[in-house]
From Swiss-Prot:
Gene: Nucks1
One BP term from GO: positive regulation by host of viral transcription
Localisation per UniProt entry: Nucleus; Chromosome
Source species taxonomy: Eukaryota, Metazoa, Chordata, Craniata, Vertebrata
Record organism: Mus musculus (Mouse)
Cited InterPro entries: HR_DNA-Binding_Protein
Modified residues (Phosphothreonine): T179, T202
One MF annotation (Gene Ontology) recorded for this entry: transcription coactivator activity
UniProt feature, compositional bias: Low complexity: 91-100
Protein name from the UniProt record: Nuclear ubiquitous casein and cyclin-dependent kinase substrate 1
Residue ranges, compositional bias (Basic and acidic residues): 64-77
């Protein structure tokens, strides 16, 4: 199918030139009317909050500024007070040191004034005792000799001590004398014990000499008869 042909009209723009100029002038004289945009309630709340926050921030900043100013003033006052305190302490120390130095000077002057008359008194005393110094020195020499003699005496005493020790040697103990107990039981009368026999058999050399020197004595008649009777019994 073929499309239908449109009817085209030829338009002369020369007819509309004046009207176009008038529209341009009208647009220049009065601009298009501005439409008012309605703000939503959320945006209004946000604006109010932002306003409050801004006010609070401004108040906080003002308070901070005031505090900083006060701190600065306090620090300045404290620094001035500290300076004054340091000055007072220095002044007190200086005054104390000056007073101590004055006291020392006064004491030294007093001591010097006391020493001068003492020296004057000591001078004649030394002149009087000057002659006895030599004697004193001689006495010192005697003391030195006395010390040397003491040392010698000590040495002699030390040497004599071991001799005393030798003298104090322990003495040998005496042998206990044993007394023979009498023999119990039957014993023949007249028989000597073994110890007595041994003593009789071993005559001492002195007794032998005496027997050799002394001549044999003659037996009496009674002793001879007794010997014979004893031999007959045996």
């Amino acid at each position: 199918m073929s499309r239908p042909v449109r009817n085209r009209k030829v338009v002369d723009y020369s007819q509309f030139q004046e009207s176009d100029d008038a529209d341009e002038d009208y647009g220049r004289d009065s601009g298009p009317p501005a439409k008012k945009i309605r703000s939503s309630p959320r945006e209004a709340k946000n604006k109010r909050r932002s306003g409050k926050n801004s006010q609070e921030d401004s108040e906080d900043s003002e308070e901070k500024d005031v505090k900083t100013k006060k701190d600065d003033s306090h620090s300045a006052e404290d620094s001035e007070d500290e300076k004054d305190d340091h000055k007072n302490v220095r002044q007190q120390r200086q005054a104390a040191s000056k007073a101590a130095s004055k006291q020392r000077e006064m004491l030294l002057e007093d001591v010097g004034s006391e020493e001068e008359p003492e020296e004057d008194d000591e001078a004649p005393f030394q002149e009087k005792d000057s002659g006895s110094d030599e004697d004193f020195l001689m006495e010192d020499d005697d003391d030195s000799d006395y010390g040397s003699s003491k040392k010698k005496n000590k040495k002699m005493v030390k040497k004599s001590k071991p001799e005393r020790k030798e003298k104090k040697m322990p003495k040998p103990r005496l042998k206990a004398t044993v007394t023979p107990s009498p023999v119990k039981g039957k014993a023949k009368v007249g028989r000597p014990t073994a110890s007595k026999k041994s003593k009789e058999k071993t005559p001492s050399p002195k007794e032998e000499d005496e027997e050799a020197e002394s001549p044999p004595e003659k037996k009496s008649g009674d002793e001879g008869s007794e010997d014979e009777a004893s031999s007959g019994e045996d």
